[in-house]
Amino acid sequence: MLSTPRTLKCLFVCLAVGIAGVSSARHVRVQEEGESLDGVVDLHVHAGPDSRPRSVSDLEAARGAAEAGMRAILLKNHFTMTADRASLAMDQVEGLEIFGGVVLNRAVGGINPEAVRQMVEFSGNRGRVVWLPTFDAEWYVKNVGEDGAEFVSIMQEGIPVPGVLEVFSVVAEHNLLLATGHSSPEEVIALIPEAKRLGVQRILVTHVFSQGATREQMKQMASENAIMEIDWLAVLNGSRSITDYTMAIQEIGAEFFVMSTDLGQAGNPLHPEGWHAYIGAMREAGISPGDINMMSRRNPARLLGLDPW
């Protein structure tokens, strides 16, 4: 399905703002029957403090995940590093692995290899992920953002900018996970071989449907052993359907996907609630327990360097 800039703008506004009024609780123990969250790993957790309204703090998100039996969460913030926050949360919450990373938006200097190096050096060793630009990505700004807004280029005339290659080298040196942010499918397909050439071992295509990747483009990404994220928020706000996801899973293979929530927006369900609904919807759509386990536990654990579940 082709997406117009207007459609894409609506999609990402929904992703950023969320659906108001779904839940006002700040921290609850989810006690729904049927869908165990034991061992689940969420690679897309938003929480506060943030410059955007969030439903929970880092600590509240971590406590909720631990109480639900989840194995690990990855804290994501579009404008500041989260490795330090993950370390602080780890000191307060038992029974849960908590990781962070850095998004290479303008707030940290854009394509800034030094931001990645400093993240790695922070005490606690919780920095595991580098995201290419998200809200400041060229594709995002031109298709979704405000007219004339600044963006961070990762390619020029079809060639990666030098800073991107240096970032890839730092990612490879420290065996980090590279996530593609809001890069276009064409940029992702061009950059994956460059990252692998420089030694990057693990690549995550950030919510692959949201940037409008076609099925053939997804197959190209899979052929390079990239893992593609499919998030619950896009289904929750109606921009994607479970059928979109299940068709791709059945055609390409569950081994190339990870499920995540991308929740944390004020007014949206809490992360464990999202997981219960997401897993239930996948089961109802005919996805096998084994494939759900692969996409919600095994694949994301491997991407974070954890032992297989």
Spell out what each predicted region is:
Residues 26-96:
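An N-terminally biased module of ancient metal coordination in phosphate/nucleic-acid-related enzymes
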Residues 169, 176-240, 258:
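Catalytic pocket-lining loop regions of alpha/beta-barrel enzymes
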Residues 275-276, 280-309:
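Mid-to-C-terminal alpha-helical segments outside catalytic/metal-binding sites
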